[in-house]
Amino acid sequence: MTRRYWNINLEEMLEAGVHFGHGTRKWNPRMAPFISAKRKGIHITNLTRTARFLSEACDLVFDAASKGKHFLIVGTKNKAADLVASAAIKARCHFVNKKWLGGMLTNWSTTETRLQKFRDLRAEQRMGKLNSLPKRDAAMLKRQLSTLQTYLGGIKYMTGLPDIVIIVDQQEEYTALRECVILGIPTICLIDTNCDPDIADISIPANDDAIASIRLILNKLVSAIIDGRSSYIRNH
């Protein structure tokens, strides 16, 4: 995998608060190599390590995108939801930003069935078929459609398991991360000072609570994916 320059600078990360960790009582000792200091009762992340792993992650996604691979971005907590959706749409990635339904990947056949139901209902709505049904039936199907849109809207074009999964918060999305590990799907994960750095394939030590921090990390990864996709299009 070729190493590239991704314009990751420490000043930008400081401004975004990427270095702020959790309170010193809420930490995972495995994060010690990624922590540079304690300040006013909170751990401070070593941004040199953050830059290194973010750069590695950008190399990985660029390489995968340049080969036409598919990505899934997962981040369901309120702070991250909108950022996840906009980043994914920008880079034409699949995303889950409301709730991770257990077994979404490990029980893919069930997910496929739900997706087919979702596509069928969307098609019926577009053609106006729902409006020709009795009022009660139409209302029930519209509720179903709304629920499916909420939970599966970001993966409606997914036709198989993703090649790489990007996870915004390890603790919040632990079920999704475990499913990827079980299936051997490579993962990139933001990890705060209370996380385990040994679960994901590439763990990026960063503040997973601040919107500015999440936005910065996602923007770098998405830019790398977009560059990789451009390379893929040029060569095919």
Swiss-Prot record:
The record's Gene Ontology biological-process terms are: translation
Q: Which SUPFAM superfamilies match?
A: Ribosomal protein S2 (SSF52313)
InterPro entries documented for this protein: Ribosomal_uS2, Ribosomal_uS2_bac/mit/plastid, Ribosomal_uS2_CS, Ribosomal_uS2_flav_dom_sf
**In the UniProt record, does the keyword DNA damage occur?**
no
Q: Which Pfam families match?
A: Ribosomal_S2
Q: Identify the keywords attached in UniProt to this record, alphabetized.
A: Chloroplast, Plastid, Ribonucleoprotein, Ribosomal protein
Primary location: plastid
Q: Which GO terms describe its molecular function?
A: structural constituent of ribosome
- Disulfide pairings: none
Output a single Gene Ontology CC term carried by this record.
Answer: chloroplast
Compartments in which it is found: Plastid, Chloroplast
Write down the CDD domains for this protein, in alphabetical order.
RPS2
Q: Which NCBIfam families match?
A: rpsB_bact
Q: Which family does it belong to?
A: Belongs to the universal ribosomal protein uS2 family.
HAMAP family per the UniProt record, alphabetical:
Ribosomal_uS2_B
Query: What is the name attached to this protein's record?
Result: Small ribosomal subunit protein uS2c
Q: Write the lineage as a comma-separated list.
A: Eukaryota, Viridiplantae, Streptophyta, Embryophyta, Tracheophyta
